[in-house]
Every structure is written in C-alpha cells, then in structure tokens.
Amino acid sequence: CIGMDRAAFKELMGPFEVFRNAHSKEQNQLGQEQTDCPKLDLANYEYRRVLGVGGFGLVSLYARKSDGELFALKKMQKALIVQEEMQKFVRQEKLFLAELSGNSFVPILDGSAQDDDSVYLMLEFLSGGDLFSLIEQYGALDESTVVRFTAACTILGLQHVHKHSIAFRDLKLENLVIDSKGYVKLVDFGLAKRILARSYTFCGSPRYCAPEMVTGKGHNKGVDWWALGVVLFETLFAMSPFDDNCDDVELFRRIANEPLEFPGYPQLQPNCTDFITQLLNKDSTKRLGALADGSDGCMKHAWFSDMNWGDLRAQTLKSPIVPTPYKQSEDKSASDAVEVPEMHSVLTKYRQSTDPQAGWTDAF
C-alpha cells in the first residue's frame, strides 16, 4: 500500500476535484451503459454460416429477419474466458461498444446476451476484412488514395472514442476492419480503458506500443496517435518502423531511443511523411493528436487539405477501397457446433468451480 498526501496526489494525477468529478461521471456512465444495448433474441435472426474461430469461441454470420441486414455473432465460452482471466476485458468490451455504438467508425452492437456457458455479442458484419489481410494480398498500399482515406477514417474513429475519455490502446492493422462500403472501422475494445489522467498498465501489441508505455512513464490517449503512425508506416511500406523480427527487448529499445527513418522507396509526399513523423514523436507532450487541439490538429494537417471531413463523417465519399461483396451462395450448412480445442474438459472444470470474478456477466 502506498501512502500519498494531497500535494503528491495533485502532482501525479492532477487536481483532486477534477479526478473525483471525472470518476463520478465514469461510474454514472457505466451504470447507464448496461441499459443502452438491447437484449439479444436469436429468434429474430437467421443463421447463415460460421465465419471463424475467435480467441474464446466462434464468430458466425446471421441475418436479421426484419430487414436482412447481416451481423456477426461473437459467441464466447465463459470457461475459456475465466481460464485466461479475461472476465474484466470481455465485460468492458461490451460496455464500451454499447456506449460507442452508433458512430460510423465503430461497429454497431445490435444486442448482447448470455446463457449458462457463453456470452454473446451481435455485431455489425464487416465484410471487407482487415488491413493486415489487405497488405498481405496487395503489399504496400497507395499513399494518396487508400492510406490517406484509411488515416482519415481512423482519425474520426479515435476522435469519437477519445470524446468519451476512452483510450483504445490496441490500434493495429488487424483491428482496422473494412465495411461493405470500403470504410474503415475500429474493432476489438477488449484493451480499451477510460483514462482520466494516466495509466501505468502495459498492454497492446509490442510493435505498436508508444515510448511512454515501454518506459513505464505512464500513458494516456496519446498512445493511440503513436499507434496510428505505426499503422500508416506499415500500410505504406509493408514493414514496421522499428521491428525487423528482433526480440521484444530490442524492439522496445528502438521504440524508446532510435530515430524514425523512412525507406527510400516509395517516395512519399512531404506532407505525408511530416504527418507520420509528428504522430511518431517520442515526446507525448509534443505528439500530433495528443496536443491541446486533439484530433482537430490531425484533421487540419496539410496532408488532408482537400479532405471533406463532413462528407467522410456522413460516409458519402466514395472509398478507394473496394471490398469483395458478400455472396449468399457462399453460406455453408455447417452448424455452430464446431469443436473448440479442449473445450469439454475446460467447460467441465468451469461448471464445477466458483468464478473468482462473479458478476462480470451482469453486463450481458
């Protein structure tokens, strides 16, 4: 236990009154979030096929019977969640999605539910795949079209998340997913956190971690802007700015100490390199996006001088990304009874034990 007087608290966390008021607001919001998401009734949806196996279970495609709109049902086994001690993260993903849903750059959460063995999230189906898959298929992407459009979508997504005092903390190629119109959305809010001042929790994928996180100096929403810089570098060069398959210790040393260098090819517009350079400023107090003007500073950058942000927000701009359209003929007869490795033994142990974090499923 660490003792701290009022002066020490102020130096570390800021004025106590601001912290207290923000904390009260957070608690009020958490109470409200649980009523914002409708309870899921699978009878209102038609099963189509299995999309894949996630970390805790299956993701399956469903169509809403009332209008035919497609959704992805994320079914997560409670036993696996408890085994990996991820109850808190699954719960907060649901709460944050419920709070943030409705924005054009965050997936719609259409409902949630639970039964004895699983928790369920019915999410907007994003048919275009993620940026990682796009780079795997095509290699480095075009700066003036795809990369700039991706950057703009991500800026608006982070702007929405940050307005709720939430740091995303897991921005990476795999968590930027393309919808049917070619727009990019933020997915996977398991590591997101409402940050009132600073957090000292190390999290996220190593090659996207900001210097202040790897050095343990405490971080805030500024880590998301650093991660955006890494993402854009990777989309342009199909390589990481600091990681060339080195171990994590060396990677973190480079992130904290090595200067940013751009490859000689392809040649980029000066405004593009300047934008990325400002995002990858090792000093978080001088990093673009983390300054007093927040996301507005990114939107006003010269690289976006002709970007119509209003049309982008309304999704009336034509995306340079053309996703493969969903075909109903691809639906398979496979049921949701796909085996998850070691599921039976884990499930038996779970049913016979006491959940150490009982109550986390109340959010569903």
Question: Where do the model's predicted regions map?
Answer:
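Protein kinase glycine-rich loop
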Residues: 48-59
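Eukaryotic Ser/Thr kinase distal regulatory-tail detector
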Residues: 272, 313-364
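Short beta-strand micro-motifs within the conserved protein kinase catalytic domain, predominantly
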Residues: 108-117
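Conserved short submotifs of the Hanks-type protein kinase catalytic core
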Residues: 116-130
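Activation segment signature within eukaryotic-like protein kinase domains
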Residues: 150-151
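Glycine-rich ATP phosphate-binding loop
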Residues: 58-80
